Amino acid sequence: MSSKSGLFLPLSSVITSYNENTNLSLKTIDAFLGFLVVVGGLQFGYALLVGTYPFNSFLSGFISCVGQFVITVGFRMALTQQELQSSSSKKKSPVVSPYKRAFLEFCFSSLVLHFFAVNFLG
């Protein structure tokens, strides 16, 4: 019993720290990242089991899923970096908030990604 508790103790402390120290917006982004991993895994599993007959459709769906994951990770990193900078120093606020800028970059890059994904479908 002690070996199992020794294995799960670090994991439980990481989960407790994550729940206590992470705000709701970052938890929501993390949930969306988990959703993208599940959808990408389902698409890949379907391609392995059934096949990739409309290959453009498979590539478009899978690449858009992976691309959205990468864009969302960049958005999460930008938000985390802005939180660290805002807590460490109080500078004069810029014209556009760094949070708004990160969100606009996320939206624009997501639109461009999905435009190319839909265009690739044919």
Swiss-Prot record:
Stretches of the chain found on the membrane's Lumenal side: 52-54
Record InterPro entries: DAD/Ost2 (IPR003038)
Pathway: Protein modification; protein glycosylation
Membrane topology term: Multi-pass membrane protein
Residues in compartment: Cytoplasmic: 1-30, 76-101
GO biological processes: protein N-linked glycosylation
Keyword terms: Endoplasmic reticulum, Membrane, Transmembrane, Transmembrane helix
Subcellular location: Endoplasmic reticulum membrane
Membrane-traversing stretches: 31-51, 55-75, 102-122
One GO CC annotation: oligosaccharyltransferase complex
Short name of one Pfam family: DAD
PANTHER family assigned: DOLICHYL-DIPHOSPHOOLIGOSACCHARIDE--PROTEIN GLYCOSYLTRANSFERASE SUBUNIT DAD1
Entry's family note: Belongs to the DAD/OST2 family.
Known function: Subunit of the oligosaccharyl transferase (OST) complex that catalyzes the initial transfer of a defined glycan (Glc(3)Man(9)GlcNAc(2) in eukaryotes) from the lipid carrier dolichol-pyrophosphate to an asparagine residue within an Asn-X-Ser/Thr consensus motif in nascent polypeptide chains, the first step in protein N-glycosylation. N-glycosylation occurs cotranslationally and the complex associates with the Sec61 complex at the channel-forming translocon complex that mediates protein translocation across the endoplasmic reticulum (ER). All subunits are required for a maximal enzyme activity.
Oligomer and partners: Component of the oligosaccharyltransferase (OST) complex.
Protein name: Probable dolichyl-diphosphooligosaccharide--protein glycosyltransferase subunit ost2
Organism name: Schizosaccharomyces pombe (strain 972 / ATCC 24843) (Fission yeast)
Gene that specifies this protein: ost2
